UniProtKB/Swiss-Prot annotation:
Places the protein is found: Cell inner membrane
Molecular function as annotated in GO: carbohydrate transmembrane transporter activity
PANTHER family linked: PURINE EFFLUX PUMP PBUE, SUGAR EFFLUX TRANSPORTER
The keyword Acetylation is assigned to this record: no
Transmembrane segments: 14-34, 51-71, 84-104, 110-130, 137-157, 171-191, 213-233, 249-269, 276-296, 300-320, 334-354, 361-381
UniProt lineage: Bacteria, Pseudomonadati, Pseudomonadota, Gammaproteobacteria, Pseudomonadales
Example of a GO cellular component annotation carried by this entry: plasma membrane
HAMAP family assigned to the protein according to its UniProt record, in alphabetical order: MFS_SotB (MF_00517)
InterPro entries hit by this protein: MFS, MFS_dom, MFS_Efflux_Transporters, MFS_trans_sf, Sugar_effux_transptr_put
Organism from which the protein derives: Pseudomonas savastanoi pv. phaseolicola (strain 1448A / Race 6)
Protein name: Probable sugar efflux transporter
Amino acid sequence: MITSPPNEQAGSWLGVFALALAAFIFNTTEFVPIGLLSNIGQSFEMTPAQVGLMLTIYAWVVSLMSLPMMLATRNIERRKLLMFVFGLFVVSHVLSAISPSFAILLVSRVGIAFAHAVFWSVTASLAVRIAPPGKQVQALGLLATGTSLAMVLGIPLGRVLGEALGWRTTFLGIAGIAALVVFLLARALPLLPSQNSGSLRSLPILFKRPRLMAIYLLTAIVVTAHFTAYSYIEPFTQTVSRLSGEMTTILLLVFGGAGIMGSIIFSLFSDRFPNGLLITAIGTLTVCLLMLLPLSGDATALGTLTIIWGMAIMCFGLTLQARVLSLAPDATDVAMALFSGIFNIGIGGGALLGSVVSSHLGVANVGIVGGLLALGGLGLCCFTTHYFGKIQPAAEVQAESK
């Protein structure tokens, strides 16, 4: 007996869960090299700072291709689109696992980045769309939990597997799990015709929304600040803090677990204190980055800082994602494609800046440089919050139509 697809209107936690699991896979593969920089470098006789450029290339391909790929696929039914995306994802990971050179590894990562560009352009809006009525914030929180679990389980387990069996095994394992996720998505998601995806004609309208432009600028600054330090947390903990490989893995676990706590905080307070939550998150992140070096010699203090840091960056990312969706309800996919692209500009910029700092000033200073940049983001956030006052996205959208 053939069963019909789930009913989109009824809302589906299973569908949201499937998207969260897919988010787990995508975030695992984007950031798992952070825990494997040294291992990959040994295979190709490169330094961690040189290998770290693969993070920059990946992120910048995503940033450049998010909008073009979203526009190219805007009329494709979303469930079918996700099947194609994961097909490319799996094939590219197999290529990563058998790469005979760093250049081929980069080519495989570009293929994964193309899949990433499409996935994150549509996923947040899909999660909101298929969530049970009145549960949109919780759906975003569950999606964020998938992201956090990538930090809690994906990256540390990828590091453990890479150290035990080689980094190639890590990428092969990701390909296998992704193949299972494809099956779950096919079973759990309803048919999802493209809806409110927008087009190139949406861009001038979005660019006329100053609140949205401020969010994009803030995203670029703060994400760059964060990844200036986080991209090189493995060499930092091992060379500056003098922690063992096992302790470094535990620290990555702690960071990811804190991200889950951050998503819970977002779910509880985002509706009541949107501005306060955002300012607090950026301020906390700034302090954590600036204190990274001073506290690096005390494992307990460094662990505590890592917990606070993980909560702060998760609250920041979720708050901005929710605001983008609320400020562009008429072109959600275009707006989220821009957000994903700009977020990845920050990831790539942070990885590049961290590489420069590591090479010229020493890896010990990545937190200081990132913290100073985050301080600028905090100033921008305070200014825009005061300037725009209470955010009323619906009123802004209605004003544009007059």
